[in-house]
Every structure is written in structure tokens, then in C-alpha cells.
Design a protein with these regions (language model features):
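N-terminal secretory signal peptides
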Residues: 1-8, 16-27
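Bacterial lipoprotein signal-peptidase II cleavage site
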Residues: 27-40
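Beta-alpha junction/loop-to-helix N-cap segments that form part of ligand/metal-binding clefts
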Residues: 38, 60-66, 74-144, 153, ...
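Extracytoplasmic "Venus flytrap"
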Residues: 48-67, 87-94, 116, 177-184, ...
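An alpha-beta-alpha
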Residues: 53, 149-206, 229
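Hydrophobic alpha-helical segments within soluble ligand-binding/sensing domains
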Residues: 96, 152-171, 184-186, 212-216, ...
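Extracellular/periplasmic periplasmic-binding protein-like sensory domains
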Residues: 243-314
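Segments of small-molecule ligand-sensing domains
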Residues: 306-310, 321-379
């Protein structure tokens, strides 16, 4: 079995940083940059990466791409060279399908992504069991429904919603992006669990991407309803806006988010003191000692702290490498010819990942412990 700690410890971080940094420089800002060896050497396995590398959601896709690149370096061996090629989907389903087709033309044998839920649902519907797809952060049950070669690394919407409800014991305002599959899916699951648990949801507010520059109106209604906790399964950029708006209007409440909010402390221009006391359901913490080697390696290469999106994508590549080893496939074969064997291997492997101990069920959903953190003094503390 491939171990993260063994892999990270076997390499020179400085040498790895120089090698990866040099390649990234050659690729520049192009969305078609690749990592790895020559495809005709009999040792190269091609992994495509799809996510938003430009546009409003680019920060999530770029983080995932960086994590995947680092993993490709770490899990390549003398007999297995993991080659990566990234394509930009701008968090759009149609563009994600176009990106998938482009990667197929390149010779992709397995896919990491898409990063966002809507795009992942679109691509998984096109795969027809002809490609191993491991998405780092798409959480809807629709991603893997009726698919045999599609897998998730992040928690599913019901898991996140139900787990979050266990931590909520106040007057709650539910706040989510009604135009986003991830956000609305987790919100629905939370509301269902809240009803079963007899939690007190006093207000429900929504927004869409084109109205995410101010949430004063929604917060005013939540405050008037007496909400002391806002459960918001949203990404970290709108979360930073919400917290600033709340401070400006003097609304003292607790914000609770899910894994998409990880990265809040790194939002450019954000006053991180506003995040004090924020409760997060996320499988990864850069402050956790067990992730120290990965965090150091990531910082050495990218000069920034990794977030959950980077860690999830790293675990995707780790899982694919483990599945290749388990399946004992011909790594020069077409993706369609080996997808079934890789999928069978995915359901048998167990990896000690950055985001927990990961296994997968028959539906392709990840099974790992749900964890919660509270932000205190700019660090993640176990809740």
C-alpha cells in the first residue's frame, strides 16, 4: 500500500519544488499544461484534471490543480510516471464536457474532477462507465448515481448536512446559494436532518452568484428572526462577504459552514479576525500535525497554505495510484479498457489520506469520519 508519509518523506522537498516550479513556469497560465513523462515510454499513465481555472470559482479549481500536481510528483515511481493535463471548465457543465472531450483526445486514462458539483454531474453523465472519474469536491449524490466508474473524495451532501446538524443547537438561519448544486444540496440535507432532530430553523435565506456582493438584506431578516447561528453551506469567498456585512450591521452571530468554506482565512483583503469562532465541517486542517509534511511541501512549491480543495485533489491522485497498483493493469491501455478494473480496485482499497482514512462503497461514495473545527486565533481547532 502506498503511504502518504512514506511518499512525502522519500523525496527532497527542495528538489521537488524546483522541478515542479520549473514545469509550472513553462506551462505559464495555459490551461493545457501537463506534468509527467513521455507517453510512449511504456511507463506513463495520463490523468486529466478538470476544474475552474478562470472565472469566479477559479480559486477552487486552481487549488485542486496544485494539489493534484504535487501528488503526481509524489506518487510517480520509476515504473509509473503520472502525467497530468489540466483543462478549464469555468465551473460550467457544458464547458466541462468540452474539457473532458479535449482530454480524451490527449489520451486521458483517468480523470480527477470536475471540481464543482454542477460540472461533475454533467461530466459523469457523459462517461458511460468508460473512464475512471474521481472528483475531489463534488458532493451531490447525482454525481455517482447509477455510475460504476465514478467516485467522490469529499463528503456527500446528506453526510455533510446530517453531520452539521449535530453541532447546531441554537436558533438557526439557513443561508445558501439556490443556484449552486452543492450549496442547495447540503442545505436540503441539513433542513431534513434539522426537522428530524427538532432543531429550530427560524429563517431561510438564499442568494445567487450574481447577487453575492452584499448579503445585508438577508442578514437583516435573519437577525430580526432571532437567529444566533447561521448555517451556510457556501464557498469561502461569499462567506467572507457575509462576515463583513454582519460586522458592519452589528449582527453578533455564529457562522457555521461546510468543506467549501475552507480557505476563508486566505481570502485576499479579508480581515481574518472576523472568522473568529466560525465552525467548519471539513475533513482537512493545515494546522493538523499529521498533515505537516504535505503543508511544508505545498508551501515550498506554491508559497501558500493548502486548503481542503488541494488536499482532496491530492487524495484523488493518491487513490488512483493505489487503484493502479491494486488492479495490476497495463498502464499503456486506453482509459475505456481499464476503467472497469480500476473501479473494482477503488472499491477494495483503503488509503490513509490527507482528509482521513478513505474507503469507497458500491455507489462510489467515500466513507470517512466527519470532522469539525472552530477557527480560533487564525487556526483550526477540533470542535
Amino acid at each position: 500500500m502506498l503511504s502518504i508519509n512514506n511518499v512525502l518523506n522519500r523525496r527532497s522537498f527542495l528538489a521537488g519544488a524546483a522541478a515542479l516550479g520549473g514545469t509550472a513556469a513553462l506551462a505559464g497560465c495555459s490551461s493545457g499544461g501537463s506534468e509527467g513523462g513521455s507517453a510512449d515510454d511504456g511507463k506513463t499513465f495520463k490523468i486529466g484534471v478538470i476544474g475552474p481555472l478562470t472565472g469566479a470559482a477559479a480559486t477552487y479549481g486552481v487549488s485542486a490543480e496544485k494539489g493534484a500536481k504535487l501528488a503526481a510528483k509524489d506518487f510517480s515511481t520509476k515504473d509509473l510516471k503520472l502525467s497530468l493535463k489540466s483543462e478549464d471548465d469555468v465551473a460550467d457543465g457544458e464547458k466541462a464536457i468540452n474539457a473532458f472531450n479535449t482530454l480524451c483526445d490527449w489520451g486521458m486514462q483517468a480523470l480527477v474532477g470536475p471540481v464543482t458539483t454542477g460540472a461533475a454531474v454533467a461530466v459523469s453523465g457523459e462517461i458511460a462507465d468508460d473512464m475512471l472519474m474521481v472528483t475531489p469536491s463534488a458532493s451531490s449524490l447525482d454525481v455517482t448515481k447509477d455510475k460504476t466508474t465514478v467516485f467522490q473524495v469529499c463528503f456527500t451532501d446528506p453526510t455533510m448536512g446530517a453531520s452539521a446538524a449535530k453541532y447546531a443547537d441554537a436558533k438557526i438561519a439557513l443561508f445558501y446559494n439556490s443556484g449552486d448544486t452543492y450549496s442547495s444540496g447540503v442545505a436540503d440535507a441539513f433542513a431534513e436532518q434539522a426537522k428530524e432532530s427538532k432543531l429550530d430553523i427560524v429563517d431561510t435565506e438564499t442568494f445567487k452568484d450574481d447577487s453575492s456582493t452584499s448579503f445585508t438584506n438577508q442578514l437583516t431578516k435573519a437577525k430580526e428572526a432571532g437567529a444566533t447561528l447561521i448555517f451556510a453551506p457556501i464557498y469561502y469567498t461569499p462567506a467572507s462577504v457575509l462576515l463583513k456585512n454582519a460586522k458592519d450591521m452589528g449582527y453578533d452571530m455564529t457562522l457555521m459552514g461546510t468543506d467549501g468554506m475552507d480557505g476563508l482565512l486566505s481570502v485576499e483583503g479579508f480581515d481574518t479576525s472576523l472568522a473568529e469562532g466560525v465552525l467548519l465541517m471539513t475533513p482537512f486542517s493545515a494546522d493538523d500535525e499529521k498533515n505537516a509534511d504535505f503543508v511544508k511541501a505545498y508551501k515550498d512549491v506554491y508559497d501558500e497554505t493548502p486548503n481542503q480543495f488541494a488536499a482532496d485533489a491530492y487524495d484523488c491522485v493518491h487513490a488512483i495510484a493505489e487503484a493502479i497498483d491494486k488492479a495490476d493493469i497495463d498502464i499503456t491501455a486506453d482509459g475505456a479498457d481499464i476503467a472497469g478494473d480500476l473501479a473494482k480496485a477503488m472499491r477494495k482499497i483503503k488509503i490513509d489520506g490527507l482528509t482521513g482514512e478513505l474507503t469507497w462503497n458500491d455507489e462510489g461514495q467515500v466513507e470517512k469520519p466527519a470532522t469539525a473545527y472552530v477557527i480560533q486565533d487564525g487556526k483550526y481547532i477540533s470542535a
